[in-house]
């Protein structure tokens, strides 16, 4: 019998998750179906309940419902509790298990696919929203030399630094405080690239040894990556690899099989080109 999975969001028509999971299933010999589920704001619980009642086995959650999924789950992993957000729900034995695979997806893309160790590196993350909250704990697990969050509203960055202090030291600053400082890894976790804009970074943050990573994926260079390229950053990467890696972790949670990701990432980049 084919097991049913889906991704739920609003909007959802743009999601590449069905393509990714169908390729994972084909490669690992798993019998699943995977679809997109649209939910009106305020109807997340109703739509999920209907999905479970129809025999659904698991859900991926995208914007704007990761907080709803966190509250919906009856059992949470440590990384989901740290993020206070869930992107993977599993329905088993009458319970709802919540996990967050965003951070491990980012770390695997950087460390394994890009072959750029995080341990001992100076890491800068731009933004202080949900995207940052979802990845801080796995990054801190890698033991960077330092981890700095920069945000227009410093108090939001400070709140995150305080929340994650039990996992490691996190510095919170405004963008102006980055003047005269450089970093080994700079991660853009703001939504500026979606609006064809750029965070207000001072010059000098990037060096020829810097990995510039935009969590948004694009067919061309985002404004953030264009800026990094113009300042001679050593390596540029968008978030497509993270998307595939977080999906692979979800797939492994559901199916007990760890799919190979590089081929799927390359296929997806061709599809999006």
Curated annotation (Swiss-Prot):
- Record-annotated residues binding shikimate? 15-17, 62, 87, 102, 217
- Binding of NADP(+), residues: 78, 127-131, 151-156, 215, 239
- Catalytic activity, per the record? shikimate + NADP(+) = 3-dehydroshikimate + NADPH + H(+)
EC annotation from Swiss-Prot or TrEMBL: 1.1.1.25
* Matching InterPro entries: Aminoacid_DH-like_N_sf (IPR046346), NAD(P)-bd_dom_sf (IPR036291), SDH_C (IPR041121), Shikimate_DH (IPR011342), Shikimate_DH-bd_N (IPR013708), Shikimate_DH_fam (IPR022893), Shikm_DH/Glu-tRNA_Rdtase (IPR006151)
Source superkingdom? Bacteria
Q: Where is the active site?
A: 66 (proton acceptor)
Pfam families xrefs: SDH_C, Shikimate_DH, Shikimate_dh_N
Q: What class of enzyme is it?
A: oxidoreductase
Q: In which pathway does it act?
A: Metabolic intermediate biosynthesis; chorismate biosynthesis; chorismate from D-erythrose 4-phosphate and phosphoenolpyruvate: step 4/7
> Which terms does the UniProt entry file under GO BP?
amino acid biosynthetic process; aromatic amino acid family biosynthetic process; chorismate biosynthetic process; shikimate metabolic process
- Molecular function GO terms recorded: NADP binding; shikimate 3-dehydrogenase (NADP+) activity
| A Gene Ontology term for the protein's cellular component | cytosol
**What keywords is this UniProt entry annotated with?**
Amino-acid biosynthesis, Aromatic amino acid biosynthesis, NADP, Oxidoreductase
Record-stated family: Belongs to the shikimate dehydrogenase family.
Q: Which HAMAP family match?
A: Shikimate_DH_AroE (MF_00222)
Main function: Involved in the biosynthesis of the chorismate, which leads to the biosynthesis of aromatic amino acids. Catalyzes the reversible NADPH linked reduction of 3-dehydroshikimate (DHSA) to yield shikimate (SA).
- Subunit details for this protein? Homodimer.
Instruction: Tell me the protein's name.
Output: Shikimate dehydrogenase (NADP(+))
């Amino acid at each position: 019998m084919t097991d049913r999975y889906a991704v739920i969001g609003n909007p959802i028509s743009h999601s590449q998750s069905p393509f990714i999971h169908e390729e994972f299933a084909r490669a690992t010999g798993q019998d699943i179906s995977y679809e997109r589920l649209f939910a009106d704001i305020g109807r997340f619980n109703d739509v999920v309940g209907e999905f479970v009642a129809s025999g659904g086995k698991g859900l991926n959650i995208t914007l704007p419902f990761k907080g709803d999924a966190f509250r919906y789950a009856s059992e949470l992993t440590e990384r989901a509790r740290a993020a206070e957000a869930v992107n993977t729900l599993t329905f088993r034995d009458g319970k709802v298990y919540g996990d967050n695979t965003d951070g491990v997806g980012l770390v695997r893309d950087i460390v394994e696919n890009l072959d750029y160790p995080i341990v001992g590196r100076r890491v800068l993350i731009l933004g202080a929203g949900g995207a940052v909250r979802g990845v801080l704990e796995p990054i801190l697990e890698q033991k960077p030399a330092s981890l700095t969050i920069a945000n227009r509203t410093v108090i939001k960055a400070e709140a995150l630094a305080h929340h994650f202090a039990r996992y490691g030291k996190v510095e919170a600053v405004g963008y102006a405080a980055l003047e005269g400082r450089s970093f080994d890894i700079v991660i853009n976790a703001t939504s500026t690239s979606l609006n064809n804009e750029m965070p207000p970074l001072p010059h000098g943050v990037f060096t020829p040894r810097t990995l510039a990573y935009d969590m948004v994926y694009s067919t061309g260079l985002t404004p953030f990556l264009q800026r990094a390229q113009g300042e001679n950053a050593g390596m540029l990467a968008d978030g497509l690899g993270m998307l595939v890696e977080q999906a692979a972790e979800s797939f492994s949670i559901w199916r007990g099989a760890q799919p190979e990701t590089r081929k799927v990432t390359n296929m997806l980049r061709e599809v999006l080109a």
